[in-house]
Curated annotation (Swiss-Prot):
Segments passing through the bilayer: 42-62, 100-120, 145-165, 171-191, 216-236
Gene name in the database record: sel-11
Coiled coil location: none
SMART domains reported for this sequence: RING
Official protein name in the record: E3 ubiquitin-protein ligase hrd-1
Organism: Caenorhabditis elegans
RING-type zinc finger locations on the chain: 292-333
Length: 610
């Protein structure tokens, strides 16, 4: 259930009447009744609430006389600002705890009362530009409000000043600065009202009104920032830091910053409009809708309509007024600086592309006169190169849309350098990688062994002699060590080539290690360990026989010509084994010899089955 204002007013009046009647019934006289009311906290709370209700009723009466019915935007702004002012008042009560009294509370309520009329006057003057009809009653109301507010602000500022001089520093400093800031607001509202009045008297639109409004806002915000700064300094010297003035001080600084930026950006936009935006011709106006969306009037060639970077056309004077507040297109809200920066970025990109092409040509010319990098190893590594022609695209080439093809990519091997020795040409090029399962790294065969040229009487077997750099001229050496763009690009390209070579070598070593299996060394029991070890039991022999087949997949060093049984295995073994048997049979025990024969028979039988 929502409590209405009428119910609150009626309840407050009834509670006040009951409180006063109770005091007179108890004390029977006027003076004792007043003392009783002033000493009772409950009675004073009821009287305070009744005073707030009376102030609210007076505000509603003056509002209806001076402003009439409020618009929705005005009521919303008034409500928001009132809540902020109430919170700031509560913070001010905490700062001035020693000066807290009934008079102090009444002064803050009166300050809030006058602030509300300042806010309403500001919003109502701003509505003048958007109102189609301005009546004589509106002018009478506004002039009355501005005169009354100016007189009240001046009176309270002078009262606070003289009170501070005669009685010393007190809470009156706060009220003096608050009314001084309100007086600056009255001055701002008066300037806007006069500018709007002058604009309404002219039959045509006044182009310079926005300029004056912008400079007036900058001037008033500067005054407010100076007042808040001076107030903070005085409060720090006299009392303490004014915490309740932080929010309005921040808002004033931000408004000053915004006004300063608006002045700069508006001047830049107007200069750009006069110098860079083209004037639309009569043929273009005839081929399009010639209605200006700002003023809703027909555009003609005499009015010099301007075309924005987004291709929308408006009156020059309409754009001048529009650019005073914002630098966007009135139709599509495109930032005019963004469009200009986009065009400039396109030109810069074209220039950069041309510079890169020139740098590549210059780098190629510089690299052509240098000796090849590692001529003996250049053919051993594959470099991903783009084949000539669109028809020569390989399966691993980039697909449409700029995405790389499926892995593995096709590798194109760079040709061998022209100054390579002849015996290096006999080495065949590395074969293509063997196909493997999809998604796996391609299997590379081991690198081919270098073939030695057996031709006699040729001098190609000697390695090439390193080139002599003493024949280079001073100009060529300076070009090689230069700090120009072309030299830096050539160095970066050489570093990239080195990285590609290193990565290719690492890749081939990984592939070689993956393809080549690791051959485990066969464990052959030594003679000394067999002599010292006691005869194994049947369980140990069985466990050893179970462990031996686990390594049967690895290649063995024992070879046989034909499968044989365990009884004939010793006779078909290698000569080394046969020759070693008679020499060790005399030193081994029969049990150890039997174990040895079983092991040899087991190994030879598995190799024969493989």
């Amino acid at each position: 259930m929502r409590v209405s204002a009428g119910l609150m007013i009626g309840g407050s009046c009834v509670a006040t009447a009951a409180t006063i009647l109770n005091a007179f019934l108890i004390n029977k006289q006027f003076y004792p009744s007043i003392v009783y009311l002033s000493k009772s906290n409950a009675s004073m709370a009821v009287i305070y609430v009744q005073g707030i209700v009376l102030v609210y009723l007076m505000f509603q009466l003056l509002k209806s006389i001076l402003f009439g019915d409020l618009r929705a935007a005005e009521a919303e702004h008034l409500s928001e600002r009132t809540w902020h002012a109430v919170l700031e008042t509560c913070l001010a009560f905490t700062v001035f705890r020693d000066d807290f009294s009934a008079i102090f509370v009444m002064q803050f309520i009166g300050l809030l009362f006058i602030k509300c009329f300042h806010w309403l006057a500001d919003d109502r003057v701003d509505m003048m530009e958007r109102s189609p009809v301005i009546t004589l009653r509106f002018h009478l109301r506004m002039m009355t409000v501005l005169a009354a507010l100016g007189f009240a602000d001046s009176y309270f500022v002078s009262s606070a000043y003289f009170t501070t001089i005669t009685r010393g520093a007190s809470a009156q400093i706060v009220f003096g600065f608050e009314y001084a800031i309100l007086l600056a607001l009255v001055l701002h509202v008066t300037i806007k009202y006069l500018l709007h009045m002058h604009d309404l008297r002219n039959p045509q639109s006044w182009d310079n009104k926005a300029v004056y409004l912008l400079y007036a806002e900058l001037f008033i915000n500067l005054i407010r920032c100076l007042l808040y700064g001076f107030f903070a300094v005085v409060m720090l010297r006299v009392h303490t830091f004014p915490l309740f003035s932080v929010r309005p001080f921040y808002q004033s600084v931000r408004a000053l910053h915004k006004a300063f930026l608006d002045v700069i950006l508006s001047r830049r936009a107007i200069n750009a409009m006069n110098s860079q935006f083209p004037v639309v011709s009569a043929e273009d106006l005839a081929a399009m809708d010639a209605t200006c969306i700002i003023c809703r009037e027909e555009m003609t060639v005499d009015a010099s309509p301007k075309r924005l970077p987004c291709s929308h056309v408006f009156h020059a004077h309409c754009l001048r007024s529009w650019f005073q507040r914002q630098q966007t297109c009135p139709t599509c809200r495109t930032d005019i600086w963004q469009g200009r920066n986009g065009a400039a970025a396109g030109g810069n990109a074209a220039d950069a592309a041309a510079n890169v092409a020139d740098a590549n040509v210059a780098g190629a010319q510089i690299g052509a006169g240098m000796p090849p990098f590692l001529p003996f190893l250049g053919h051993q590594f594959g470099f991903p190169q783009q084949p000539a022609g669109a028809g020569g695209a390989q399966p691993g080439a980039a697909q449409a849309g700029g995405q790389p093809g499926p892995f593995p990519h096709q590798i194109f091997y760079a040709p061998a350098p022209a100054n390579r020795p002849e015996f290096m040409n006999l080495i065949p090029p590395p074969p293509l990688p063997m196909a493997g399962p999809p998604g796996m790294f391609p299997m590379m065969p081991p690198p081919p062994l270098p073939q030695v040229n057996t031709t006699q009487g040729t001098s190609s077997e000697t390695p090439p002699v390193n080139p002599s750099y003493s024949q280079l001229s001073t100009e060529e050496l300076r070009r090689m060590e230069g700090e120009s763009r072309e030299a830096l690009l050539a160095r970066l390209q050489a570093m990239d080539n080195i990285m590609v070579l290193l990565e290719s070598a690492q890749m081939q070593m990984i592939q070689l290690a993956t393809v080549t299996p690791i051959r485990p060394r066969p464990v052959v029991p030594s003679d000394e360990s067999e002599q010292e070890a006691p005869g194994p039991s049947t369980d140990q022999v069985t466990s050893e026989e179970q462990e031996i087949p686990a390594t049967s997949s690895a290649p063995s060093i024992f070879r046989t010509e034909s499968p044989s049984t365990s009884s004939t295995a010793p006779s078909t073994s290698s000569p080394v084994t046969a020759s070693s048997t008679p020499t060790t049979s005399s030193t081994r025990t029969p049990e150890a010899e039997e174990v040895r024969q079983r092991r040899l028979a087991r190994l030879l039988g598995e190799n024969a089955n493989q």
